[in-house]
A protein has these predicted regions:
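Conserved catalytic network of the ASCE P-loop NTPase/AAA+ motor domain
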Residues: 61-64, 102-104, 119-122, 149-154, ...
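Hydrophobic positions on the alpha1 helix immediately C-terminal to the Walker A/P-loop
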Residues: 54, 58
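Post-DEXD/H (motif II) to motif III coupling segment of the RecA-like Helicase ATP-binding lobe
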Residues: 122-207
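Cys/His-rich short segments
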Residues: 1-19
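Conserved strand-helix element at the start of the C-terminal RecA-like helicase core
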Residues: 43-52, 62, 67-79, 209-222
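Inter-Walker segment of RecA-like/P-loop motor cores
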Residues: 80, 85-120
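N-terminal pre-P-loop "Q-motif" helix
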Residues: 16-39
Length: 222
C-alpha cells in the first residue's frame, strides 16, 4: 500500500547562474526534452565532464511543472555532497535520505542513496541515478527494481555514469535506453590518449612482472 504522490506548486527554483559549454548545453537540452517526453536516457560522460551542472535544467523544468524529483546515488558521501551543492543552487526545500539521515519530509527535490528508493512507490516524475556503475547499485536486481517502482507510471529516468555497465549496454542495444556520450571535460579539450613508451627492453619488463606474479600479491598496472 502506498499514498499517491501529490503534485507540488510549480516554481522557478534554479538559482545557479553558471554557463555550460556547447557540449554540455546540447546534453542539457536533450535531458529537458526527455523530461517533456517521459523518456529513459543514459548520459555516458567522462569524469570531470560536469554531469551535475548538465542535469540542472531538467530538474528545474520538472519542478517548474509541479513534479517531484529524486537524485539517487549508491554512495552516502556523494549524496551528502550533492545535497550541499543543490541546496545552494535551488530555492526549494530538499530532503536528504541515507542510513543516518533525519526522518523524511515531503519535498519537491529528494537526494538519496539508491537503497532509500525502496521506500518509495510511484513517487517521482524525474528520477536521476548518479554513478550507476558503482557498488552497490551496479548489476543489483533489487535496486534496479526499486528504481523502477519509485517512478510514476509516466516518468523520466536518467542514468549518469563515466563507466557504462553490461546491463545498461544491453538496454541501449535493445533500444530500451537512449545513450548520450560526452568524451570531453568541462574545459572542452579532448581526452589525452596514452601512448606506450618503453624505456627499457620488453624482456626486462616481462621478467619483473613474472617475478611479481610469483610473489602472490596483486599487481596493478598503469
Amino acid at each position: 500500500y502506498h499514498l499517491p504522490q501529490q503534485s507540488f506548486k510549480g516554481i522557478d527554483a534554479l538559482l545557479w547562474t553558471g554557463t555550460l559549454t556547447p557540449y554540455q548545453a546540447d546534453i542539457s537540452k536533450q535531458l529537458v526534452q526527455a523530461v517533456d517526453q517521459k523518456k529513459q536516457i543514459l548520459v555516458h560522460a567522462v569524469t570531470g565532464a560536469g554531469k551535475t551542472e548538465m542535469i540542472y535544467a531538467a530538474i528545474s523544468s520538472s519542478i517548474a511543472s509541479g513534479g517531484a524529483v529524486c537524485i539517487a546515488t549508491p554512495r552516502t558521501d556523494v549524496a551528502r555532497e550533492l545535497y550541499t551543492r543543490l541546496s545552494n543552487d535551488f530555492s526549494v526545500p530538499i530532503s536528504l535520505l541515507h542510513a543516518d539521515s533525519p526522518p523524511y519530509f515531503r519535498t519537491p527535490l529528494v537526494i538519496s542513496t539508491t537503497h532509500q528508493l525502496l521506500r518509495f512507490r510511484e513517487a517521482f516524475d524525474l528520477l536521476i541515478i548518479d554513478e550507476v556503475d558503482a557498488f552497490p547499485f551496479a548489476d543489483n536486481p533489487a535496486l534496479y527494481y526499486a528504481a523502477e517502482h519509485a517512478q510514476k507510471t509516466a516518468a523520466t529516468l536518467v542514468y549518469l555514469t563515466a563507466t557504462s555497465t553490461d546491463t545498461l549496454d544491453k538496454l541501449v542495444s535493445s533500444d530500451l535506453l537512449k545513450r548520450i556520450t560526452l568524451s570531453r571535460r568541462f574545459h572542452g579539450h579532448p581526452l589525452v590518449v596514452p601512448k606506450p613508451i618503453f624505456s627499457q627492453p620488453e624482456k626486462i619488463i616481462y621478467r619483473h612482472i613474472q617475478k611479481q606474479r610469483n610473489s602472490g600479491f596483486p599487481l596493478l598496472l598503469f
